Amino acid sequence: MNKALQRELKLFFLIPKNIYLPISIFGIIFVIFLVLDLDNSLNYASSFIASFITIFIISENTFKDDHANGYLEQKLSESGISDIILYLLAKWIVNVFFVFMPIAAISLIFQGHEISLELFGIYVIMLSTLYFFFNLGSAISLKRNNSLNALLIIPLLIPFIILVKGIFVDGQLEPNFWFLFAYFVFASSFIFYTILQVLRIQSR
């Protein structure tokens, strides 16, 4: 795990766009909504849309560079299943700490929420769930170099969006949190496994 995590950390910090691109995309979209001076009730919508688009864009490149330089194909052909799982987990962990957490903090501040560990954790879970779903689209469209398959994933997220709205807009933490957590478990298990299998097929 340490080796995979070290590699992802090096890639994140040695490639400038990995540092500034996610927060820049989120910031630009969010500022546009602020300039439009939308009603306070739409603060959630503006931050969610900004988060949604940001995760969608960065997920397009999750496997792109590793596929282009042959690392992904080599990894899938030479490594065992456990190494591939660690490879995917390392990518997610780096994004959690350096992309999702900053976005969650900024979003909660501008939504007027107190940054409690509970809401902060829920927001990170929300972003992680989006990440897994969009990574599936990225894996499917790896050789086609388009976002069509990622767009096809979006309808699967409609119930998820309703749950998140129930938490952050309606303030109904129960039972929405547990449904949201179930969505995260589904994404981090079944969707994660599907990503793994799709990548193995793509490497043939």
Go through the PLM ranges and name each one:
Residues 82-109, 184:
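Selective transmembrane-helix segments that form parts of the transport pathway or gating/packing helices
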